[in-house]
Amino acid sequence: MTKDLLLELGLEELPAYVVTPSEKQLGQKMVKFLEDHRLSFETVQTFSTPRRLAVRVKGLADQQTDLTEDFKGPSKKIALDAEGNFSKAAQGFVRGKGLSVDDIEFREVKGEEYVYVTKHETGKSAIDVLASVTEVLTELTFPVNMHWANNSFEYIRPVHTLVVLLDDQALELDFLDIHSGRISRGHRFLGSDTEILSASSYEDDLRQQFVIADAKERQQMIVDQIHAIEEKENISVEIDEDLLNEVLNLVEYPTAFLGSFDEKYLDVPEEVLVTSMKNHQRYFVVRDRDGKLLPNFISVRNGNAEHIENVIKGNEKVLVARLEDGEFFWQEDQKLNIADLVEKLKQVTFHEKIGSLYEHMDRVKVISQYLAEKADLSDEEKLAVLRAASIYKFDLLTGMVDEFDELQGIMGEKYALLAGEQPAVAAAIREHYMPTSADGELPETRVGAILALADKFDTLLSFFSVGLIPSGSNDPYALRRATQGIVRILEAFGWDIPLDELVTNLYGLSFASLDYANQKEVMAFISARIEKMIGSKVPKDIREAVLESDTYIVSLILEASQALVQKSKDAQYKVSIESLSRAFNLAEKVTHSVSVDYSLFENNQEKALYQAILSLELTEDMHDNLDKLFALSPIINDFFDNTMVMTDDEKMKQNRLALLNSLVAKARTVAAFNLLNTK
């Protein structure tokens, strides 16, 4: 016989960004609890609102499954003494399992007999097991916790109610300072405390109190209501997924409505209006069917449609206050002079250990010119890079960006165009922030990409130079994101610039404001970002092998990893890797530089390998390179089968090591083959 279990935790309002991850976590913790305690079940369903986290288990067994376990003990010769009685070792073993020597039997394992005991454990009732089910709540982890009242414990928010039901039976349990029952809280304004009659009636009981407990249902209600408004008003609404997920975790009973604002604000840049609505007010942006921005918005109320007209007016009033600010800054900022703003950046701190933003820009200007040369930009593009690098942070001192910091770069582009800057310069000001996330949009222009690279390189090298190096998950200056942006941009634009050479040359630049340091740590940090770009689906040994190659060109490293993944499926992969690995391992024994002396060869296999290496021409096609290297496998194996590399003749030994080293020098441009696993 099975039953349904309900566990609901009622809390004060949770931050929206915490709700969905916590709901998912709760489901996972419950599944683990049931599996660890041998309670079988059919399904686990989770629920969440800003004021509750809940999980329901359907088809829960009324008793644990019985457990039978075999335990292996000491060998028979240790388990029995000279008289054939059980030794202290055997007695201690069975006692530790809660059994006696009468339970011992001997089983043969690989030709030797060992003590074995079998332990049977009858399953407990579900009621007894569930006495500790609040463990799943204790084990939840949150980004931040808090104290309340005089309690010593911490949790994400103060806890008010705990409901634990097995079908319609309320279980009496305690969590923190709360005793469980069947009372849950309804909507803060429209509902009241209510009894949950049974685990199966949970959603319906709360619905009567204006709470939609199922987040998916709540989300669909919002989407359906928005679509209904779209149809009625003949408009188009951008349903941004991140905004939708945030809004559904701000409300327990959603009602969408259409608001409006004065058309005069449409003269303000669209990005300002969208940021005001979406980022600051959590409103959905409204356009006409052709995509033109309209003086409207859609918001979602936490409640029903009663007195909705008052809610609409209140939301319109709040939005207009923000739009007034945007309009004011738009007009005032146009009176500013870019040169004056750049000069004022001397007084703005980039970081107290590194210097001012002006000094940061000064270094970026030099780096960008070097990069523009390496990337073979045209003279016109180089001039645009130089100009952009000279001014690109000016918008940080505008009123608009001070109020709406999400618009940095975006407003820089607009103000630059208004000031008569070239479109390429203006676009670069916006694009230098890209990508803004691990998989975010990349710059579209070469000028913008070079400026983005220069800005990110100086940021990375500057922070590392003063010892501000990320550790663990701690990365307050977003250096991982910046470095990920570097490798993505280099790969996307096909700039095959070796990163080791690039970083070394950057360290060779001279600045009055800062001396770069910690080059080795920087290279290791960059390698870690390339490994992340390769992806965890590529086996670890392949990732390590290509990162230890002598190729520091991002695109070639990525191609080599894919080529090895593909080759690893071939029948000849194992034997080819093993022969190359043997060559790599022996080449490590080279103690000093020696040229290969053909006259010292003693057999045809040495000569054949020598000629094969001379003929080996590797290109930037990593798939073709692997074909060529794998084709050498029979020749390499013949060499090893017929040649003693580590001979007593020192001259002969060094010559053979030099021969292998010449092979390894070429092969290492693809990967460090001795790091590849063939087992």
Curated annotation (Swiss-Prot):
One of its GO terms (cellular component) is cytosol. Its EC number is 6.1.1.14. It catalyses: tRNA(Gly) + glycine + ATP = glycyl-tRNA(Gly) + AMP + diphosphate. Keywords: Aminoacyl-tRNA synthetase, ATP-binding, Cytoplasm, Ligase, Nucleotide-binding, Protein biosynthesis. GO terms for molecular function: arginine-tRNA ligase activity; ATP binding; glycine-tRNA ligase activity. It is found in: Cytoplasm. GO terms for biological process: arginyl-tRNA aminoacylation; glycyl-tRNA aminoacylation. It is an enzyme of class 6 (ligase). The keyword Nucleotide-binding applies. The keyword Iron-sulfur does not apply. SUPFAM superfamilies: HD-domain/PDEase-like. Belongs to the class-II aminoacyl-tRNA synthetase family. Tetramer of two alpha and two beta subunits. This is Glycine--tRNA ligase beta subunit.
